[in-house]
Amino acid sequence: MRNFISFYVLIVLCFTIISCKDETEISDFEVSEVTFDTKLRDVLTRKGFNFSENGELICDNQVLNTTSLDLSRCELTSISGLRSFPSLADVNLECNSFSIFDFADLPEGIKSVALRGNDGITSYLNLISTDGTTVLCKSLTNLKLPYFAKWNTDVIPAFYKAMTDKCLVVMSDEDGNYTEYTVNRRVPDPLLRSYLYRNFPSVFVSSLEIDVTKRITEGNDLIFLSQTANLEGVEYILSNPGFRGKVDISGVKSKHYSMSYVKPSSGVSVFSISNIDTPLGMDLSSASSLKVLRVENNSSLQLVVVPSVILNDDVSETSIFDSEIHISGCSSLLASI
């Protein structure tokens, strides 16, 4: 009987020691103080990562040792919190729903990022400094971009030039295949190409292609009445930091026209588009000299953020339009700020 009691006590003691050890191991793990995007947290939870009751990532061995994550097709709009993975080197973020992609949300040691299928991205943050001289994400050795990254003429080209020998940059084509990134862009329509080449030769590397890293030196306006539905190429001119002048582009109302990415540079004083859709919206954040805004018959336009400068300046003597802000025929417009 005495032996049985001793054996029972030994079992209880062992169980207590093991339990205490497990609790100690769990309590030893730190929690991330970085705020996680709710959808990203849900995705990571389904992948087996642990979060506290307060939504903080528990930095256990699984987190500390994770070097690769496949977060493709997860409908993510943000990766806030992902920098909590200290060993993460490779992340697949293809086919999500980003509109802004912030490289500051990635771990400092990140090496490879895949973004194919995220054609809604209009802004790339914290990849390189705003003046294009300092790379902020120096650890990258492989950057895979979505097709619509070709419209980005400030951040991506500057990063590409600065990291040519250190980072392989590729970009998806229209069919979803990755091809080597280049700063040269073709202008498909011969009539438009001829007009741009004649008025802005400083950015052409041949009669067919524009180099988006070159700065416009001509003082010409961009005024074009299109006879073709293909306006690809005007985006590279109106967003060029060297452009100074007016932009007035019109299409025939009976035809369908589209400008994929509209981001007027700081030198644009008048911006007018008529009978042209802008499926990725209009980014006027850089248009610090804008005095006149006119948008007519743009069925895809949902939001217009009007720079304060256009609301404060008196341009009654110089305006070529009846009013400083004129927006009409935009059936999808949700708000004008």
Segments predicted by a language model, with ranges:
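Bacterial Sec-dependent N-terminal signal peptides
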Residues: 1-28
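N-terminal capping/linker segments that flank leucine-rich repeat
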Residues: 20-75, 81-84, 119, 129-253, ...
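Short beta-strand elements of solenoid repeat domains
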Residues: 70-71, 92-94, 114-116, 248, ...
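Post-signal peptide N-terminal segment of secreted/secretory-pathway proteins
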Residues: 77-78, 90-94
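Long amphipathic alpha-helical scaffold regions
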Residues: 97-126, 295-314, 319-323, 328
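Long, charged/polar, surface-exposed segments that mediate recognition or autoinhibition
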Residues: 101, 261, 281
